[in-house]
Amino acid sequence: MVNVEEIRNAQRAQGPATVLAIGTSTPSNCVDQSTYPDYYFRITNSEHKTELKEKFKRMCEKSMIKKRYMHLTEEILQENPNICAYMAPSLDARQNIVVVEVPKLGKEAAQKAIKEWGQSKSKITHLVFCTTSGVDMPGADYQLTKLLGLRSSVKRLMMYQQGCFAGGTVLRLAKDLAENNKGARVLVVCSEITAVTFRGPSESHLDSLVGQALFGDGAAAIIVGSDPIPEIERPLFELVSAAQTLLPDSHGAIDGHLREVGLTFHLLKDVPGLISKNIGKALDEAFQPLGISDWNSIFWIAHPGGPAILDQVEEKLGLKPEKLRATRHVLSEYGNMSSACVLFILDEMRKASARDGLSTTGEGLEWGVLFGFGPGLTVETVVLHSVNV
């Protein structure tokens, strides 16, 4: 007769959770940031707001974004004028879009990750799906299970409306699932479509306008598992530890509220200051067990909430400019895609490391950190260990 302890030991994996594959996807509609203010004020019938348009132009110029991808085309917006208004009842129209499109975009990213992984999709044991938009029952996790043809017994976890920190959250959850379930292979998908937050400009709500200048659409998928099968699975990064914390004195710094008018977005000016002031403590707690205190000796993946956050973190910690290269590259090429961003950066980093002939997936370095920042103000901190190329 076996005891519970023996059963538990048999259920656990031997090694750390490992990222085994990464896939990304975007809508086909690409938006040039330099011409976006003209387009945005025209499509929202706001061209008479000339001073506000100049303000928005400056926001776009300072955003450090070159282009973004958006499911909302001019044609879709013309068919749904209420989405273009500042505060018109439009939730039904928005929901009709995202409930369908979020799982579809997630499917494209997942198929790429599964292809790189090289194993049969029938070996996926768990699915973690994360999106800020489109709450529905059954959820996007169910829709994706059907779209991909996953096993009906796949264990699903659906995360709605977490916001920009959630790319770190899904890694934390996937780590626990993989390490506590021997042989588990977790498909993690973050799919974000901004149709819930798009709205016309208003002088009274400038933080909403900041969102209109930053947010883009994208989906990223990863496969996570412990004890990679030699010769078959190729590890990319190991997930060493993961923590979540609420920053002090940050209540109301980033808020989102689902209303008849869609998801309204509220942002206090001091968000970059709050993050940069507290990031050192998060790093100390994460890396003290490893005896690491030189933040230039590790590789960096930080959610690019906006350029001001990156600039202030860089300055506060004395980071060399190249530390946030991968992060800034993704911000420039895609904008802020909420939870999907850090997974895009993970993908960019391993690809650039291989392209540049570096010795590890983490820009030639052994240890790294991944940060998610979002509503709360919540910070997710994931310690990563790179793999030799």
From Swiss-Prot:
Q: Does the keyword Transferase apply?
A: yes
Record InterPro entries: Chalcone/stilbene_synt_C, Chalcone/stilbene_synt_N, Chalcone/stilbene_synthase_AS, Polyketide_synthase_type-III, Thiolase-like
Q: Which residues form the signal peptide?
A: none
Q: Which UniProt keywords apply?
A: Acyltransferase, Flavonoid biosynthesis, Transferase
- Among its keywords, does the record have Transferase? yes
Q: Which GO terms describe its molecular function?
A: naringenin-chalcone synthase activity
Q: Which PROSITE patterns match?
A: CHALCONE_SYNTH
Enzyme Commission identifier(s):
2.3.1.74
Which reaction equation describes what this protein catalyses? (E)-4-coumaroyl-CoA + 3 malonyl-CoA + 3 H(+) = 2',4,4',6'-tetrahydroxychalcone + 3 CO2 + 4 CoA
Functional pathway: Secondary metabolite biosynthesis; flavonoid biosynthesis
Top-level division of the source organism's lineage: Eukaryota
| GO BP annotations, alphabetical order | flavonoid biosynthetic process; polyketide biosynthetic process
Q: In the UniProt entry, which residues are flagged as the active site?
A: C164
Query: Per its database record, what is this protein's job?
Result: The primary product of this enzyme is 4,2',4',6'-tetrahydroxychalcone (also termed naringenin-chalcone or chalcone) which can under specific conditions spontaneously isomerize into naringenin.
Q: Which family does it belong to?
A: Belongs to the thiolase-like superfamily. Chalcone/stilbene synthases family.
Q: What is this protein called?
A: Chalcone synthase
Organism for this UniProt entry: Catharanthus roseus
Q: What is the organism lineage in this UniProt record?
A: Eukaryota, Viridiplantae, Streptophyta, Embryophyta, Tracheophyta
